[in-house]
A protein has these predicted regions:
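Residue-level recognition of conserved beta-strand positions in structured domain cores
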Residues: 46, 59, 73, 81-83, ...
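A short beta-strand-loop-beta hairpin characteristic of the jelly-roll/cupin
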Residues: 54, 64-91, 101
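Conserved hydrophobic/aromatic beta-strand scaffold that supports enzyme active sites
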Residues: 31-33, 44-48, 69, 86, ...
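Ligand-binding loop in jelly-roll beta-barrel domains
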Residues: 38, 85-86, 90-91, 99-126
Length: 131
């Protein structure tokens, strides 16, 4: 998907350069929060990855609850859990990531991708805001 097609399909918009979390990414990403942290029981954000951009392996820790849900809005990307094959991520797909599972996600080499992400809460607090 080229940039023009991607911009039309990305209904929530690209957002701003994700400078606060750049250290956790290979390539450039953009963040558009859709809910305000701390004022909503679930943090929802549109994270846009440029082609070849991905985040580092990471874990969303939680003793109870927690986890992450990714919903592919536009473009194509990859999702991988440690010890498993990478999964192609396309518009309309939903990936549920349990707490304490090491994983990464990002764009394919020739496509932008935007997985809208939801961070589930732990005891009424947002416990993870990594993109």
């Amino acid at each position: 998907m080229n940039k023009e097609e991607f911009d039309k399909a990305n209904v929530f918009g690209k957002g701003n350069s994700n400078v606060n979390y750049a250290q956790y990414f290979i390539g450039e990403s953009f963040l558009n929060p859709l809910t305000e942290q701390g004022k909503c029981p679930v943090f929802l954000a549109n994270v846009t990855f440029e082609p070849r951009c991905r985040n580092n392996w990471h874990i969303h820790h939680a003793a109870t609850g927690g986890g992450q849900i990714l919903i592919c809005i536009a473009g194509e990307g990859w999702y991988q859990e440690e010890g498993k094959e990478a999964v192609s991520f396309k518009p309309g797909m939903v990936i549920t990531i349990p707490a304490n599972v090491k994983h990464w996600h990002g764009a394919k080499k020739d496509s932008w991708v935007v997985p809208t992400k939801l961070h589930q809460i732990k005891k009424s607090e947002i416990y993870c805001v990594s993109a």
